[in-house]
Structure formats: C-alpha cells, structure tokens
Amino acid sequence: MPEINRPLSPHLSVYKWQVANTLSILHRATGVFMTLGSLAFAAWIVSAAIGPESYDRVLALLAGPLGLLVLFGWSFAFFYHLGNGIRHLVWDAGYGFDKHVARMSGWFTFIAAVLATVAFWVGVVA
C-alpha cells in the first residue's frame, strides 16, 4: 500500500474559529470549575464542623480579593452552565439547529450568564 503524505486527523488550522467552539469549551471548563468549587464549598462546610477558628480562617480566605474573585467566577460558571444546559435540552427536543438560531442562542446564553452573575453579586453586596 503506498504511503500517503497527509494528516490522519484534521489540523486546527483548517477550521475557522467560531462562537460554537468557544461556547463548547467554556461549557466543559465551567463544569470542571464548578466541580472544583464544590470541593472548596465542602471544605468551608467541614471547617464549620471543625470549629470556629477553622471557620474564621476559611471565611477570611474567601472574603479576601482572591477568594471573592474565585466565588465570582464560580457563580458565573454556575449560571453559564445552567443556561447552556437548558440550551442543550432544547436541542435534545429537536429545536434550534439552524446556524443562525444556534449562534444567537449561544450569545444569549453567554450574555444572560454575565447579567445573572452581576445581578447575583449586586444582590449579595447590597
């Protein structure tokens, strides 16, 4: 059999980067981030069970700038993953496969997640 000088799998340079690529990767990343955040949440709960000193240490860590940034990211991950999960359920029902509709629903999901995150944090701070 003659050797054919071509790639066995497509190269990334062949594909044009699209919103769908980014949203798919973001959906997976937010799922991983929420899982890791759940471990941090469990550590916070365990620290409360250990005693007040441990709880105060964890609370101080979460109330600091880095902790607030992580919590803000965790809440965005929650809202985005929730919205995109609903989007996938709509797809499972057989709707929204038109390219334009899929692109617009992706943007809607992302913008809604940003707005929900900001609204949540405005409610938390107020």
Protein language model regions, located:
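Membrane-embedded alpha-helical bundles that constitute the cytochrome b-like, heme-associated redox core
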Residues: M1-A126
